[in-house]
Amino acid sequence: MKKNWKYSLLLIAAVFALAMGVFFLFYRFDNKYTARGDQAIQGILYVPDDDSVHYLAREWEYYPDILLTPQEIKEQKEDYYSRYVSIGEYGGMDMGDKNKSPFGSGTYRMTLVLPEKEKQYAIGLTEIFSAYKLYINGELMGQMGNPDPDNYQEQIQNRVFTFEGKGTAEIVIAVTDKHSVSSGIQYVPVLASPFKVNIIRGLSLMIAVVFMAFTFFVLIFSVYMYMRTKKVEF
């Protein structure tokens, strides 16, 4: 019996060490907040003339409680309150204010300073909660659901949008959410070439599958250890 317990403890320790190793790999290689690369400063990101990947995590220009178009921002920017936020910094539209509702509308904006030679770029958006319009260089590039509060219709989906750009490019995302657990943009958008953005999407899917398989393995192992312990006690 002591030998069985010894082997069981060694197996538990091995599974625990494996779990810690997997979580560390997720933190090291799938953490968009700690990934290398330039970040925006006060809503402006300088994109070098290379094929690098940019995780748009920091200092988005954010207009709370309102849906704006690029034209409205251009013409009346001084009339609207804005602040700089990081993606995922807050779990809702309340911006950490406990007296406000976590639901509502908001507009995110970032300016890209691109190389002078025109290139094709892609921006990957993961599950924005729960309806939005994406504008690039003043044009409506895509829409999920309907963020208009009076005609609200949610639609949550991973999407990739491509565009040609050089010089200066403006990204505007107008978002509305009425009842999700987390509101607004909670997952870091990624900017790169279309090929790299799609590779990253594929890797993220693979990591999710591996994580689910590992979780299932731990569950089966826990049931096995429970049944084995019951037999030993009997």
Residue ranges and their predicted role:
Residues 2-117:
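Extended carbohydrate-recognition surfaces in non-catalytic/accessory domains of CAZymes
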Residues 55, 105-111, 120-122, 158-160, ...:
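Intrinsic-disorder/low-complexity, polar/charged segments enriched in Ser/Thr/Lys/Arg/Asp/Glu/Gln
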Residues 112-137, 171-173:
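Aromatic-lined ligand-binding clefts that engage carbohydrates, nucleic acids, or primary amines
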Residues 117-119, 138, 156-158, 162:
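Beta-strand-enriched, solvent-exposed domains that form extended recognition/catalytic surfaces
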Residues 153-213:
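An acidic-aromatic loop/edge-strand motif
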Residues 198-234:
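Core alpha-helical transmembrane segments of integral membrane proteins
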